Structure formats: C-alpha cells, structure tokens
C-alpha cells in the first residue's frame, strides 16, 4: 500500500509539472523570427546525411571589415545582434541585414559579406552540419 501511495503522489506531481511550467505564461513572450524552406536568395534548404554536428558562433566584424569569398556545405542561419552586414553572392545579388534580422545562409553558393557601417557588427551563426562536412570553405 505504501508503494502504491508513493507512486500516486509521484505521478500526480509529475502530471502537474506542465501546468506549473506555463502557469505564468503572461510573463513569457514568444516571437517567431522566421520560418522558411529556402535561403535568402531562394535556394531550397536540404539537410546533409551523416552524424549530426551543430555549431554556434558569435561573429564580430569591425567597421568596413570584409569577409573573403566563401561558401557553406551545410545549412546555417544567423541573427544580427548589432550593426549591419551586406552580403553579396557570386552572381551579384546583394542584400543588407541589420539588427534583429534573421539571415538564412546560402548553401554551396559563393558569397562574401562586408560591414558597411561605422560601428561593430555582431551576429550569431548556427550551422546544422555533419561531422564529415565543413561549415565554411574559404575560396582561394
């Protein structure tokens, strides 16, 4: 009987957790930043096969700093924390991203980025890769 009572008490506590977790939901605000199946220049996102590897980077670009031409083998996206970055693809497409913007990166398309402003640009990049693929390949 004691075992059954303990089981019931633990079960009730466990079942009450979800309601407790959202009891004060007015204190929590959720904002969808983006939802898409393609990158900013409309290339379809396809996840690679293999053992998963997630990488997150904080990138800080000084004013007027320019990235070398590069491409990504894996899907990635970024969130601009401060400043602006101007991205240009090898075909000449250009897009500016500023504080609060989500950047869905191009996959296997050469591109570069520049901080066109007079302040530091900071952004976080998340790569959804695999152990056998490089996140970024710098063009020589």
Feature names for model-found ranges:
Residues 74-91:
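Glycine- and acidic-residue-biased ligand/ion/polar-headgroup-sensing regions
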Residues 8, 17-53, 96, 104, ...:
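A short, N-terminal "cap"/entry segment at the start of jelly-roll beta-barrel domains
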Residues 66-67, 84-88, 102:
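Short beta-strand segments in beta-sandwich/barrel cores
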Residues 55-72, 107-110:
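Conserved short histidine dyad/triad with adjacent acidic residue
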Residues 71, 79, 116-120:
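Extracellular/periplasmic catalytic domains that process cell-envelope and extracellular macromolecules
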Residues 61, 91-108:
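Short acidic-glycine-tyrosine-enriched beta hairpin
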Residues 108-133:
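Ligand-binding loop in jelly-roll beta-barrel domains
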């Amino acid at each position: 009987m004691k075992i059954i009572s303990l089981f019931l008490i633990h079960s009730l506590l466990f079942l009450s957790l979800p309601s407790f977790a959202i009891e004060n939901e007015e204190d929590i605000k959720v904002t969808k930043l983006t939802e898409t199946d393609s990158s900013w220049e409309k290339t379809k996102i396809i996840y690679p096969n293999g053992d998963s590897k997630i990488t997150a980077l904080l990138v800080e670009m000084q004013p007027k700093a320019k990235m070398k031409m590069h491409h990504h083998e894996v899907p990635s996206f970024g969130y601009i924390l401060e400043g602006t970055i101007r991205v240009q693809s090898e075909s000449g497409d250009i897009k500016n991203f500023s504080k609060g913007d989500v950047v869905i990166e191009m996959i296997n398309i050469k591109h570069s980025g520049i901080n066109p402003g007079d302040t530091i640009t900071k952004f976080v990049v998340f790569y959804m890769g695999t152990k056998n693929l490089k996140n970024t390949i710098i063009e020589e």
